[in-house]
């Protein structure tokens, strides 16, 4: 166990599950987007009038074909029902002139203290600009684990951040998490007494700060995960070595 290895362990715990969920989200986003961004066409582009013969001519419309002004929704989040609403969803936002708004809010329960998710789907201009904002307070972390990297036995987290998607492809996002009162279980290493001593000293951590950035495109994006866990582990290594040195006095 090293300071760098401990930081990598935390990255493994976060990156694997996060990337799996993001890939599912991108797939759903790409399937939905074409239905919410109807291209503007003129009658001349769609039809060629033939003199002396009947023909249907499509004139420019001042209203979209589909418009949902308001809908009440709910989602299942961590076995908890979260209520929300959807406003101004249309197939032709350039004509309607308003972005679609999706908003979910939930108060305290046994999984978290509060949750908020807000999405603005703005395809009213020449470039689509979609924004997702999330805010978690008091998220229960118990049971998060990764094979070989350890398990979080207990703790709470506050998470917030936003993701912007431009032209339905370019990603730019940043999220921050503050983990509090963490109980971390790291697998024992046979025959490595020092590593096991360090792991024991990390079983209770007061606070871990994590920053995650997302850059690139939907098909090719990078996750950059930074945290102060390396500093925490460095302190644990020093304490463990100091304890061993006292044993030789």
Regions found by a protein language model. Give the residues of each.
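N-terminal helix-cap/turn-to-beta initiation motif at the start of protein domains
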Residues: 59-61
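A short, compositionally biased domain-edge/stem linker segment
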Residues: 53-54
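Small-residue helix/turn framework positions
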Residues: 1-12, 16-28, 40-42, 47, ...
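A generic structural signal for solvent-exposed, polar alpha-helical segments
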Residues: 32-35
């Amino acid at each position: 166990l090293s300071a760098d290895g401990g930081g990598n362990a935390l990255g493994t715990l976060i990156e694997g599950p996060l990337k799996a969920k993001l890939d599912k989200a991108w797939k759903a986003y790409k399937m939905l987007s074409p239905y919410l961004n109807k291209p503007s066409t003129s009658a001349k582009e769609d039809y060629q009038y033939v003199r002396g013969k009947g023909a249907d001519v499509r004139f420019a419309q001042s209203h979209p074909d589909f418009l949902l002004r308001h809908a009440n929704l709910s989602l299942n989040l961590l076995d908890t029902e979260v209520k929300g609403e959807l406003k101004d969803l249309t197939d032709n936002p350039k004509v309607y002139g308003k972005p679609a708004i999706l908003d979910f809010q939930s108060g305290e329960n046994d999984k978290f203290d509060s949750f908020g998710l807000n999405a603005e789907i703005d395809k009213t201009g020449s470039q689509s600009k979609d924004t997702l904002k999330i805010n978690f307070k008091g998220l229960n972390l118990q049971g998060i684990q990764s094979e070989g990297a350890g398990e979080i036995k207990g703790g709470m987290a506050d998470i917030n951040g936003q993701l912007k998607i431009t032209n339905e492809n370019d990603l730019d996002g940043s999220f921050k998490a503050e983990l509090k009162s963490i109980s971390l279980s790291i697998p024992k290493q046979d025959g490595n007494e020092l590593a096991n001593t360090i792991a024991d000293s990390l079983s209770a951590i007061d606070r871990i700060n994590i920053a995650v950035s997302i850059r690139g495109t939907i098909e090719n994006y990078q996750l950059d995960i930074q945290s102060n866990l390396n500093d925490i582990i460095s302190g644990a290594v020093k304490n463990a070595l100091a304890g061993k040195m006292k044993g030789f006095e």
